[in-house]
A protein has these predicted regions:
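PLP-dependent enzyme catalytic core of the Aspartate aminotransferase-like
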Residues: 78, 331, 340-350, 355-387
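Conserved core segment of the aminotransferase class I/II
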Residues: 222-297, 301, 305-306, 310, ...
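Conserved PLP-anchoring active-site segment centered on the Schiff-base-forming lysine
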Residues: 110-132
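Conserved glycine-rich beta-strand-loop-beta hairpin in the small C-terminal domain of fold type I
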Residues: 279, 295-304, 314-326, 359
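A short helix->loop->beta-strand "cap" motif at the edges of active sites that frequently abuts
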Residues: 116, 137, 195-198, 226-227
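Helix C-cap/helix->beta junction micro-motif
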Residues: 28, 135, 195-196, 310, ...
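N-terminal small-domain helix-loop-helix segment of the aminotransferase-like
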Residues: 2-99, 106, 281-284, 386-387
Length: 387
């Protein structure tokens, strides 16, 4: 059976390759410090587990969902007003998805025709590229560079490219580069969208993992954002429910409606007990979320301080659960460095090249180990001479 030519657009799966090498080293008895994948090591909160468990006792909850529960959509509306200060979100402006990765991957099928153009950041989370490729669309990259604090710099985007683009993906706090949006940047993005009749698709997965300042927010809290954009909003990292796949598309009603129409053709909706768990997340207390943010900040400090102490350039890490580090010692091949780091130090990270053309020469490190384990990982890097 010949696979679709569409699959030829996708490269090798980096995580699978790294995992195979990791398993081989484990089998040899090597100590492994795995910071490659952004899966929280914190447990889900008790009230969330209880909500899911209780719902699962009801046989009616095991039927096809087909729709979002009205109380779930209302919980999202209320959360946006309470948490982000965004008023005016109505249930018709909310649609669930099985994780925002699935949502971003499918959005292009709802909005793009073959040959349409979208703008994506470089470096970026890989599904931003994949969603365009699946929809037979054309990718145009806009760079995230240290000179501009790894933030979108819309003045540097070719106006003719912007005029052709149907939408622009923005992701802040950013995976993989760890940058956090500012009011000035968001205002520039909104003005840019208006100037070029462009939809903004904002990925907001890490609003509760922001360091050294004000709490993270939402793109939709800025004046004019609801007129030009939508936001993918995830519960995965804030509430440690990555496997439950709980995400939402929120914003412009016509875009949400198109996305909902597509999902209705390929999916029977979110499992009802998971919807109940999502409601518990949205309506529940936030003290544990804040405590967890501080723990991530401790990990960020341990890793960045440790690497800088070895002579690495201090990584960019202002938000998200990732640290974006330049390769030390003048190295340039991120995959080769990751393999060397794994074999010599037992430290597993992700090569920057897997996040787009500008990612080469960097690695992404996930803050999924406690500070004492991070200290041991840094020591293993030192002993291996990788600095």
């Amino acid at each position: 059976m010949q696979a679709s030519q569409r699959l030829d657009r996708f490269g090798a799966e980096v995580f699978a390759s790294l995992n195979n090498k990791l398993l081989a080293l484990k089998a040899q008895g090597k100590t492994i410090y795995n910071m490659s994948v952004g899966t929280p090591d914190f447990k889900p909160y008790d009230h969330v587990v209880e909500a899911l468990t209780q719902a699962a006792q009801d046989p009616e909850m095991w039927k096809y969902a087909l729709r979002d529960l009205p109380e779930l959509k209302q919980a999202v509306c209320d959360y946006y007003e309470r948490r982000f200060g965004v008023s005016g979100i109505t249930p018709s402006m909310v649609q669930s998805c099985n994780g925002t990765q699935e949502g971003v991957g499918h959005l292009g099928l709802a909005l793009l025709d073959p040959g349409d153009t979208i703008l994506v950041p470089d470096p970026c989370y890989p599904v931003f590229e994949a969603g365009a490729k699946i929809a037979d669309a054309k990718l145009e990259y806009y760079p995230l560079v240290a000179e501009h604090n790894y933030l979108p710099y819309v003045a540097g985007i070719d106006p003719e490219v912007a005029d052709r683009a149907k939408y622009m993906i923005v992701s802040l706090p950013a995976n993989p580069v760890g940058s956090v949006g500012t009011p000035e940047v968001y205002e520039e993005i909104i003005a840019f969208a208006r100037e070029h009749d462009l939809l903004i698709v904002h990925d907001n997965a890490y609003s509760d993992i922001v360091f050294d300042g004000e709490p993270g927010g939402s793109f939709l809290q800025y004046p004019g954002a609801l007129e030009v954009g939508v936001e993918f909003f995830s519960l995965s990292k804030s509430f440690n429910v990555t496997g439950a796949r709980i995400g939402f598309l929120v914003g412009c009603e016509d875009v949400v409606s198109a996305f909902a129409k597509l999902r209705g053709q390929i999916d029977f909706g979110m499992f009802f007990p998971i919807q109940k768990a999502a409601i518990a997340c949205l309506n529940g207390p936030r003290d544990e979320v804040e405590a967890q943010r501080l723990k991530y900040q401790e990990r960020r400090d341990a890793l960045c301080d440790g690497l800088e102490g070895l002579g690495w350039e201090r990584p960019n890490a202002h938000g998200s659960m990732f640290v974006w580090a330049k390769l030390p010692g003048g190295r340039t091949d991120s995959m080769a460095f990751c393999e060397e780091l794994m074999e010599k130090a037992g430290v597993v990270v992700t090569p920057g090249a897997s996040f787009g053309p500008s990612g080469e020469g960097h690695v992404r490190m996930a803050l999924v180990l406690p500070p004492d384990q991070i200290a041991l990982a840094v020591e293993a890097i030192r002993e291996a001479g990788l600095y």
